[in-house]
From Swiss-Prot:
Any Pfam family hit: Phospholip_A2_1
Signal sequence annotation: 1-16
Species annotation: Vipera berus berus
Role this protein plays: Snake venom phospholipase A2 (PLA2) that exhibits medium anticoagulant effects by binding to factor Xa (F10) and inhibiting the prothrombinase activity (IC(50) is 90 nM). PLA2 catalyzes the calcium-dependent hydrolysis of the 2-acyl groups in 3-sn-phosphoglycerides.
Protein name (record): Basic phospholipase A2 Pla2Vb
EC code(s) of this entry: 3.1.1.4
Disulphide bond pairs: C42-C131, C44-C60, C59-C111, C65-C138, C66-C104, C73-C97, C91-C102
Gene3D superfamilies in the cross-refs: Phospholipase A2 domain
GO biological process: arachidonate secretion; lipid catabolic process; phospholipid metabolic process
Additional record remark: Is not neurotoxic.
Molecular function per GO: calcium ion binding; calcium-dependent phospholipase A2 activity; phospholipid binding; toxin activity
Domain of life where this protein originates: Eukaryota
Entry's localization field: Secreted
């Protein structure tokens, strides 16, 4: 179900946070976010449970935790300001929800870049039935 929802949002071209996050990932990693990170491990994609399977999956776990701290915000749909400067992502909003959400996405995109060598195809389309261990705390 999580796959269908995110793909549907992606195909509609929503000009919201999920689109922006995907753009950050594409820029930093050079991979298409949906095809590379959707349903990867226990945390990349919609929802998450269990223990992260590798450093790439941990990037998604930390991203989920960051979104969880976005109290009163709508992290999946809010549109924020950002740009790329000298290979870096720079968030434009100075305060509040939009800044927090942008920073969550920026940190995750950089995490994916730093951990590209841990990406393992065996965790792509990973079954949630393999994610039954107790979750780490945020």
């Amino acid at each position: 179900m999580r796959t269908l929802w995110i793909v549907a949002v992606w195909l509609m071209g929503v000009e919201g946070n999920l689109f922006q996050f995907g753009n950050m990932i594409n820029h930093m990693v050079g991979k298409h976010a949906v095809w590379s990170y959707l349903s990867y491990g226990c945390y990349c994609g919609w929802g998450g449970q269990g223990k992260p399977q590798d450093a790439t999956d941990r990037c998604c776990f930390v991203h989920d935790c960051c979104y969880g701290r976005a109290n009163g915000c709508d992290p999946k749909l809010s549109t924020y300001s950002y740009n790329f400067q000298n290979g870096n992502i720079v968030c434009g909003n100075k305060y509040g929800c939009l800044r927090h959400i942008c920073e969550c996405d920026r940190v995750a995109a950089i995490c994916f870049q730093k951990n590209m060598n841990t990406y393992n195809k065996k965790y792509k389309n990973y079954s949630s039935s393999n994610c039954q261990e107790n979750s780490d705390k945020c």
